[in-house]
Protein backbone atom coordinates (compact mmCIF):
# COMPACT_ATOMS: atom_id res chain seq x y z
CA UNK A 1 0.00 0.00 0.00
CA UNK A 2 2.81 2.37 0.92
CA UNK A 3 4.35 1.86 -2.53
CA UNK A 4 1.19 2.65 -4.51
CA UNK A 5 0.01 5.61 -2.38
CA UNK A 6 2.12 8.16 -4.32
CA UNK A 7 0.55 6.89 -7.57
CA UNK A 8 -2.96 7.23 -6.14
CA UNK A 9 -2.17 10.83 -5.23
CA UNK A 10 -0.87 11.55 -8.74
CA UNK A 11 -3.99 9.99 -10.28
CA UNK A 12 -6.16 12.20 -8.04
CA UNK A 13 -4.29 15.31 -9.18
CA UNK A 14 -4.72 14.33 -12.85
CA UNK A 15 -8.39 13.55 -12.23
CA UNK A 16 -8.89 16.98 -10.66
CA UNK A 17 -7.13 18.75 -13.54
CA UNK A 18 -9.33 17.07 -16.14
CA UNK A 19 -12.54 17.72 -14.21
CA UNK A 20 -11.73 21.39 -13.59
CA UNK A 21 -11.04 21.82 -17.31
CA UNK A 22 -14.29 20.02 -18.20
CA UNK A 23 -16.25 22.17 -15.76
CA UNK A 24 -14.82 25.32 -17.38
CA UNK A 25 -16.09 24.12 -20.76
CA UNK A 26 -19.54 23.41 -19.28
CA UNK A 27 -19.62 26.84 -17.63
CA UNK A 28 -18.87 28.47 -20.99
CA UNK A 29 -21.82 26.49 -22.38
CA UNK A 30 -23.92 27.75 -19.42
CA UNK A 31 -24.55 24.18 -18.22
CA UNK A 32 -24.00 25.20 -14.60
CA UNK A 33 -25.62 22.19 -12.98
CA UNK A 34 -23.45 19.70 -14.85
CA UNK A 35 -20.35 21.84 -14.23
CA UNK A 36 -21.10 21.74 -10.51
CA UNK A 37 -21.76 17.99 -10.59
CA UNK A 38 -18.39 17.36 -12.29
CA UNK A 39 -16.51 19.44 -9.71
CA UNK A 40 -18.40 17.67 -6.93
CA UNK A 41 -16.91 14.33 -8.00
CA UNK A 42 -13.35 15.53 -7.33
CA UNK A 43 -11.94 13.60 -4.38
CA UNK A 44 -10.72 16.19 -1.87
CA UNK A 45 -10.83 13.93 1.18
CA UNK A 46 -8.53 11.10 0.18
CA UNK A 47 -5.82 10.19 2.64
CA UNK A 48 -3.28 9.97 -0.16
CA UNK A 49 -3.46 13.74 -0.73
CA UNK A 50 -3.01 16.50 1.76
CA UNK A 51 -5.50 19.02 0.39
CA UNK A 52 -5.30 22.35 2.22
CA UNK A 53 -8.49 23.51 3.99
CA UNK A 54 -8.35 26.77 2.02
CA UNK A 55 -8.42 24.88 -1.29
CA UNK A 56 -11.30 22.68 -0.12
CA UNK A 57 -13.31 25.70 1.00
CA UNK A 58 -12.67 27.48 -2.29
CA UNK A 59 -13.83 24.46 -4.30
CA UNK A 60 -16.97 23.96 -2.21
CA UNK A 61 -17.87 27.64 -2.58
CA UNK A 62 -17.43 27.46 -6.36
CA UNK A 63 -19.64 24.37 -6.56
CA UNK A 64 -22.30 26.06 -4.42
CA UNK A 65 -22.22 29.14 -6.67
CA UNK A 66 -22.74 26.98 -9.75
CA UNK A 67 -25.71 25.19 -8.19
CA UNK A 68 -27.17 28.57 -7.24
CA UNK A 69 -26.68 29.68 -10.84
CA UNK A 70 -28.72 26.62 -11.83
CA UNK A 71 -31.40 27.49 -9.21
CA UNK A 72 -30.64 24.33 -7.22
CA UNK A 73 -30.47 25.88 -3.75
CA UNK A 74 -30.87 22.53 -1.96
CA UNK A 75 -27.64 21.07 -3.38
CA UNK A 76 -25.93 24.46 -3.09
CA UNK A 77 -26.66 24.45 0.63
CA UNK A 78 -25.01 21.02 0.97
CA UNK A 79 -21.72 22.43 -0.35
CA UNK A 80 -21.99 25.68 1.63
CA UNK A 81 -22.31 23.55 4.76
CA UNK A 82 -19.18 21.65 3.70
CA UNK A 83 -17.34 24.95 3.28
CA UNK A 84 -18.60 26.47 6.53
CA UNK A 85 -16.11 24.83 8.96
CA UNK A 86 -13.24 25.64 6.57
CA UNK A 87 -13.95 29.33 5.95
CA UNK A 88 -11.61 30.36 8.76
CA UNK A 89 -8.73 29.07 6.62
CA UNK A 90 -9.51 31.47 3.77
CA UNK A 91 -7.02 34.31 3.46
CA UNK A 92 -8.63 35.94 0.44
CA UNK A 93 -11.33 38.45 1.43
CA UNK A 94 -13.03 37.98 -1.95
CA UNK A 95 -13.44 34.27 -1.23
CA UNK A 96 -14.94 35.00 2.19
CA UNK A 97 -17.38 37.43 0.62
CA UNK A 98 -18.42 34.85 -1.98
CA UNK A 99 -19.16 32.40 0.82
CA UNK A 100 -21.26 34.94 2.72
CA UNK A 101 -23.16 36.01 -0.40
CA UNK A 102 -23.92 32.39 -1.32
CA UNK A 103 -25.11 31.76 2.25
CA UNK A 104 -27.33 34.83 2.01
CA UNK A 105 -28.80 33.69 -1.30
CA UNK A 106 -29.66 30.31 0.23
CA UNK A 107 -31.38 31.97 3.20
CA UNK A 108 -33.27 34.17 0.74
CA UNK A 109 -34.37 31.14 -1.31
CA UNK A 110 -35.59 29.44 1.90
CA UNK A 111 -37.64 32.59 2.64
CA UNK A 112 -35.58 33.29 5.74
CA UNK A 113 -35.68 36.90 4.64
CA UNK A 114 -34.68 38.63 7.87
CA UNK A 115 -31.59 36.44 8.27
CA UNK A 116 -30.71 36.99 4.60
CA UNK A 117 -31.11 40.76 4.96
CA UNK A 118 -28.79 40.79 7.97
CA UNK A 119 -26.17 38.77 6.15
CA UNK A 120 -26.23 40.90 2.98
CA UNK A 121 -26.10 44.10 5.02
CA UNK A 122 -23.25 42.81 7.20
CA UNK A 123 -21.23 41.94 4.10
CA UNK A 124 -21.84 45.43 2.69
CA UNK A 125 -20.47 47.04 5.86
CA UNK A 126 -17.48 44.72 6.19
CA UNK A 127 -16.21 44.87 2.61
CA UNK A 128 -17.96 47.96 1.27
CA UNK A 129 -14.77 49.96 0.86
CA UNK A 130 -13.00 47.10 -0.92
CA UNK A 131 -15.43 46.31 -3.73
CA UNK A 132 -16.76 48.12 -6.79
CA UNK A 133 -19.67 50.49 -6.22
CA UNK A 134 -21.96 48.43 -8.49
CA UNK A 135 -21.26 45.28 -6.45
CA UNK A 136 -21.84 47.19 -3.22
CA UNK A 137 -25.16 48.57 -4.46
CA UNK A 138 -26.21 45.07 -5.48
CA UNK A 139 -25.57 43.83 -1.93
CA UNK A 140 -27.50 46.75 -0.46
CA UNK A 141 -30.40 46.13 -2.85
CA UNK A 142 -30.51 42.48 -1.77
CA UNK A 143 -30.55 43.53 1.90
CA UNK A 144 -33.40 46.00 1.30
CA UNK A 145 -35.51 43.52 -0.68
CA UNK A 146 -35.14 40.80 1.96
CA UNK A 147 -35.89 43.24 4.80
CA UNK A 148 -39.06 44.42 3.06
CA UNK A 149 -40.21 40.82 2.48
CA UNK A 150 -39.45 39.75 6.05
CA UNK A 151 -42.19 39.07 8.57
CA UNK A 152 -43.32 42.19 10.43
CA UNK A 153 -42.01 42.61 13.96
CA UNK A 154 -39.44 44.42 16.13
CA UNK A 155 -36.42 42.71 14.54
CA UNK A 156 -37.57 43.65 11.06
CA UNK A 157 -38.20 47.22 12.21
CA UNK A 158 -34.63 47.43 13.51
CA UNK A 159 -33.30 46.08 10.22
CA UNK A 160 -35.35 48.61 8.25
CA UNK A 161 -34.06 51.36 10.55
CA UNK A 162 -30.43 50.36 10.06
CA UNK A 163 -30.88 50.36 6.29
CA UNK A 164 -32.80 53.65 6.16
CA UNK A 165 -30.20 55.45 8.29
CA UNK A 166 -27.36 54.19 6.09
CA UNK A 167 -26.69 56.93 3.52
CA UNK A 168 -25.61 54.33 0.96
CA UNK A 169 -29.18 53.05 0.63
CA UNK A 170 -30.29 56.41 -0.80
CA UNK A 171 -28.75 55.30 -4.10
CA UNK A 172 -30.97 52.23 -4.23
CA UNK A 173 -33.90 51.97 -6.61
CA UNK A 174 -35.85 50.53 -3.67
CA UNK A 175 -35.24 53.48 -1.34
CA UNK A 176 -38.75 54.95 -1.64
CA UNK A 177 -40.37 51.68 -0.57
CA UNK A 178 -37.80 51.33 2.22
CA UNK A 179 -38.56 54.86 3.42
CA UNK A 180 -42.32 54.24 3.43
CA UNK A 181 -41.85 50.99 5.33
CA UNK A 182 -39.54 52.57 7.90
CA UNK A 183 -41.75 55.63 8.43
CA UNK A 184 -44.84 53.39 8.60
CA UNK A 185 -46.63 55.08 5.74
CA UNK A 186 -49.50 53.25 4.10
CA UNK A 187 -48.35 51.59 0.87
CA UNK A 188 -50.64 51.46 -2.15
CA UNK A 189 -50.49 49.10 -5.09
CA UNK A 190 -48.88 51.68 -7.37
CA UNK A 191 -46.18 52.31 -4.75
CA UNK A 192 -44.91 48.74 -4.99
CA UNK A 193 -45.55 47.98 -8.68
CA UNK A 194 -41.95 48.69 -9.74
CA UNK A 195 -40.55 46.93 -6.69
CA UNK A 196 -42.64 43.83 -7.44
CA UNK A 197 -41.24 43.61 -10.98
CA UNK A 198 -37.68 43.50 -9.62
CA UNK A 199 -38.29 40.42 -7.46
CA UNK A 200 -36.82 36.99 -8.20
CA UNK A 201 -39.24 34.15 -9.10
CA UNK A 202 -38.96 32.50 -5.66
CA UNK A 203 -39.79 35.86 -4.06
CA UNK A 204 -42.98 36.05 -6.13
CA UNK A 205 -44.18 32.53 -5.35
CA UNK A 206 -47.66 32.01 -3.96
CA UNK A 207 -48.11 31.17 -0.28
CA UNK A 208 -50.62 28.66 1.10
CA UNK A 209 -53.31 31.35 1.36
CA UNK A 210 -52.92 32.31 -2.31
CA UNK A 211 -51.10 35.58 -1.66
CA UNK A 212 -47.49 36.39 -2.54
CA UNK A 213 -44.76 37.10 -0.02
CA UNK A 214 -44.83 40.78 -0.98
CA UNK A 215 -48.62 41.03 -0.70
CA UNK A 216 -48.48 39.52 2.77
CA UNK A 217 -45.64 41.82 3.83
CA UNK A 218 -47.48 44.90 2.54
CA UNK A 219 -50.74 43.85 4.21
CA UNK A 220 -48.99 43.36 7.56
CA UNK A 221 -47.22 46.70 7.14
CA UNK A 222 -50.41 48.58 6.24
CA UNK A 223 -52.27 47.13 9.22
CA UNK A 224 -49.55 48.42 11.55
CA UNK A 225 -49.45 51.76 9.72
CA UNK A 226 -53.23 52.13 10.05
CA UNK A 227 -53.09 51.30 13.75
CA UNK A 228 -50.47 54.00 14.26
CA UNK A 229 -52.50 56.48 12.19
CA UNK A 230 -55.66 55.97 14.22
CA UNK A 231 -53.75 56.17 17.50
CA UNK A 232 -52.56 59.63 16.45
CA UNK A 233 -56.06 60.90 15.62
CA UNK A 234 -57.68 62.99 18.37
CA UNK A 235 -61.07 64.66 18.59
CA UNK A 236 -61.80 68.05 20.09
CA UNK A 237 -64.49 68.06 22.76
Predicted regions and their residues:
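Extended alpha-helical scaffold regions
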Residues: 1-237
Amino acid sequence: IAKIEPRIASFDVADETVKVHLSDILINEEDYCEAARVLGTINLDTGARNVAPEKKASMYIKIAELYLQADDTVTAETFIKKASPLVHALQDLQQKMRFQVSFGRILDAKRMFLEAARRFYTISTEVGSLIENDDLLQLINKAIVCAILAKAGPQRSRMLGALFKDARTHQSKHFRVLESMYKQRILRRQDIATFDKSLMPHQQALLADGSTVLEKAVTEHNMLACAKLYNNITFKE
